[in-house]
Curated annotation (Swiss-Prot):
Record keywords, A-Z: Sporulation
Protein family: Belongs to the IRC19 family.
Gene Ontology biological process terms in this record: sporulation resulting in formation of a cellular spore
Known role: Involved in sporulation and maintenance of the mitochondrial DNA. Is probably involved in a pathway contributing to genomic integrity.
Protein name, per record: Increased recombination centers protein 19
Amino acid sequence: MAGRTILTRNAVINSTHTLIKCPEKYLLPSLEVSNLPSFVRMAYRRLFRLQSFISNRKMVRDTYGEYLRYKFKKENYDTKRSIVVGDTPKAPLREEIRNSVMFVVKAVSHLPETKDSKFAIARDNTTCRQVLKNLLTIEYEKQSLIARYRPPTKRRDMVGPYQIYRKDFTHMQELNKSAQWRVFGEFDICTVYLNEILQTRL
């Protein structure tokens, strides 16, 4: 497909990039949606539509999809956040969601970092892309551990990786238990701090 351009009703596509003609379906509306559940569903759909732009590798796209399902359907983020920053005031949920969607949009948007383009915007997009890449790398490792885990028949009291990394967040409280706990724990703690700064919910 090198040097070849494909034109469709919705996009212009070449070997490295896709230009979306009507980006509205990937962005949240500027007007406020009064119903919070509707707003959350709207954000969820838009984030899933961005999945095809996350990576050329199916493994990365699948990791992103599983990550979204967990974040929207199962994660108790307030518990995770309280481990790091306690009961300090936080940004409104709508603002966190809106900023999170914009973060992913920036991560999948390409603008060359040259003197001829808006360097600050290009650098911001690159930073978002690098952060998302690191986040999905850690998520892939967690998902792999959870998928491979088989509880020992003689140790029914043993806590599995899903309980540790997805529900109790023990790895964020007991960093010294193992090297793996430290890597995942420190990364998740840093992600919470990043969310506090950016007012996102990554």
